[in-house]
Structures are given as C-alpha cells and as structure tokens.
Amino acid sequence: MAKVLVLYYSMYGHIETMARAVAEGASKVDGAEVVVKRVPETMPPQLFEKAGGKTQTAPVATPQELADYDAIIFGTPTRFGNMSGQMRTFLDQTGGLWASGALYGKLASVFSSTGTGGGQEQTITSTWTTLAHHGMVIVPIGYAAQELFDVSQVRGGTPYGATTIAGGDGSRQPSQEELSIARYQGEYVAGLAVKLNG
C-alpha cells in the first residue's frame, strides 16, 4: 500500500476544492491510501475572518508526519510568484526531516491557484526548489491531460501541475476542466507511488 498525502493551504477555498479533486483522482488507484490535510493558518483568527477566509474541515498536518508518506502532493495559492506564507512557514519547520534525509526519494508534486494567471508556473517551480533540497523526486504532469490543449476558454493548468484562475476578486471557482486536470495529477502521482512502493 502506497501512502499519498494531499497537503494544501487555502484561504478562500480554491485550493481546497482543487485538493479534493487531486485526492479524488489519487483514490482511483488500487493500492493507494490517500489522506488530505492542510497546513496551519498563521494569520490571527480575526484578520483571517475579516479578509474573508473560508473555514475548512481538513485536519491540520504536522511537519514531522511528512515522513510517513510515499508521495506528497502540495497545493498552494500564489503569493507574488511564490508559495503562500503559510506553506513556507510549514516547510521551514522541516529542517529535522532534511537533516535525517526522511523525505529523500519520496515523490512530490505541486498544484496552485492565482488571481489572474500571473505566477502559476513560477509558484510551482519555486516550490520545487524546497522539495529538491529534501531529495524528493519531482513529478510534473506533462501534457498527458488532454484539457491542457484546450484554448477555447480561460483556464489554469500547466505541464508542471494543475492550476486554477480565481479572478482578481476570487469569485471564479475552479472549472470542470481545471478539476479534471487536478484529478489527473492525483491519479498519475498515486499510480507512480504504487508502482514504486506498493
């Protein structure tokens, strides 16, 4: 049995929705045990609420538990072309895992969201840097998801990982195409994890 963690941060719910789709895809793979967790919120509760943050039900992960999984699929919104501060804070607490090599050889993949599309790919690839320092095996999705070839509408999705465009005010929710790409990412990574660890 390969253990797959979908680990995300979501303030307004876009990445939470994408995380569920990623987990849905991963759950299709026989021999994959899929868990969805989120990183802790770092904003004071009053500010989070005032900013319109969405209450979420996924359990909160601890950095130490990352070592328990064979594959981790990270989801983060874009903050100035980088991962969110909450995800950065969480990953900055993995120094002990780095020192012991606990994540070395584990699969890692990333999905993201942006307001207008700016920074989608940069967020994913800049997140890869931290994962590479852990010796994780980076898994992009390439162009295997057919939705990536559709240019008839505005949508997220890159060969690096699934993405969604939230709109400047956050009112746009992930489209069916974007969710399909996210499901593909989950299924693809989980399939690899089972082949390597199952």
UniProtKB/Swiss-Prot annotation:
Disulfide bonds: none annotated. This is NAD(P)H dehydrogenase (quinone). It comes from the Bacteria. GO terms for cellular component: cytosol; membrane; protein-containing complex. It seems to function in response to environmental stress when various electron transfer chains are affected or when the environment is highly oxidizing. It reduces quinones to the hydroquinone state to prevent interaction of the semiquinone with O2 and production of superoxide. It prefers NADH over NADPH. One of its GO terms (molecular function) is NAD binding. PROSITE patterns: FLAVODOXIN_LIKE. Binds 1 FMN per monomer. Residues 4-189 form the Flavodoxin-like domain. Keywords: Acetylation, Flavoprotein, FMN, NAD, Nucleotide-binding, Oxidoreductase. The keyword Membrane does not apply. One of its GO terms (biological process) is response to oxidative stress. The keyword Oxidoreductase applies. InterPro entries: Flavodoxin/NO_synth, Flavoprotein-like_sf, Flavoprotein_WrbA-like, FMN_Rdtase-like_dom, NQO. Disruption phenotype: Cells lacking this gene show no phenotypes, however, N-trichloromethyl-mercapto-4-cyclohexene-1,2-dicarboximide and 8-hydroxyquinoline significantly inhibit the growth of the wrbA knockout relative to the wild-type, which is consistent with a role for WrbA in protecting against environmental stressors through its quinone reductase activity. FMN promotes WrbA association into tetramers, which are more thermoresistant than dimers or monomers, suggesting that multimerization underlies the FMN effect on WrbA thermostability. NCBIfam families: flav_wrbA, PRK03767.1. NAD(+) binds at residues 12, 51, 169. Its EC number is 1.6.5.2. It catalyses: a quinone + NADH + H(+) = a quinol + NAD(+); a quinone + NADPH + H(+) = a quinol + NADP(+). Its cofactor is FMN. PANTHER family: FLAVODOXIN-RELATED PROTEIN WRBA-RELATED, FLAVOPROTEIN-LIKE PROTEIN YCP4-RELATED. Belongs to the WrbA family. The modification N6-acetyllysine is found at residue 50. Substrate binds at residue 98. Homodimer and homotetramer; in equilibrium.
